[in-house]
Design a protein with these regions (language model features):
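Beta-strand signatures of extracellular beta-sandwich domains
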Residues: 47-51, 100-102
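A generic structural signal for short beta-strands and their flanking turns/coil linkers
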Residues: 30-32, 44, 83-85
């Protein structure tokens, strides 16, 4: 099993729920931090979801008002993502919410069993 430490940036350019991180079906991930910033001058609502591939269900884990011109950590705890899972983000205010997801990817490609 190989462990890769990675960062994935995102910029919410639409009001639709957007996949900001997806895990392939041969890996799992441990999300350590979701750093977000609001580059606008007014507060913006941020909703974040985990898509559970094995249950074909989406669960909301964040509903927050990100103040104008500020930074913060959206993940208040570590998230464990299984094979095929994803993180989605949504805001009604486009082009102001940006962020970086820091995670460890545990790749099981070629693993026996």
């Amino acid at each position: 099993m190989a462990i890769f430490y990675k960062n994935q940036g995102f910029n919410l350019t639409t009001t639709n729920a957007t996949t900001v991180l997806s895990i392939n079906t041969s890996s799992v991930a441990i999300v350590k931090d979701i750093a977000v910033t609001n580059t606008g001058s007014s507060p913006a609502t941020l909703d974040m979801y985990v898509y559970d591939y094995s249950a074909s269900t989406t669960y909301q884990f964040i509903h927050a008002s990100v103040q104008g011109a500020c930074n913060g950590n959206a993940a208040q705890t570590v998230l464990n993502l299984e094979e095929g899972d994803a993180i989605l983000a949504q805001t009604p205010t486009v082009n102001v919410i940006k962020g970086v997801i820091s995670y460890a990817l545990l790749d099981r490609t070629g693993e026996n069993g």
